Amino acid sequence: RSGRGECRRQCLRRHEGQPWETQECMRRCRRRG
C-alpha cells in the first residue's frame, strides 16, 4: 500500500484516455492520504 506512485499508476490505468479525469483522480488521492 504505497499510495504515492501506486495512486498515480492506478488513476492512469483507471482513466486511460482521459487526462482530465486522471488529474482529478490524482488530486483526490493526494487529499485522502
From Swiss-Prot:
Q: Which UniProt keywords apply?
A: Antibiotic, Antimicrobial, Fungicide, Plant defense, Secreted
Q: What does the record say about tissue specificity?
A: Predominantly in the embryo portion of the kernel.
Q: Name one Pfam family in it.
A: Antimicrobial21
GO cellular component terms given for this protein = extracellular region
- Source organism superkingdom: Eukaryota
Q: What is its main location?
A: secreted
One record GO biological process = defense response to bacterium
InterPro entries listed in its UniProt record = Plant_Antimicrobial (IPR029227)
Q: Where in or outside the cell is it found?
A: Secreted
- What is the name attached to this protein's record? Antimicrobial peptide MBP-1
Species of origin reads: Zea mays
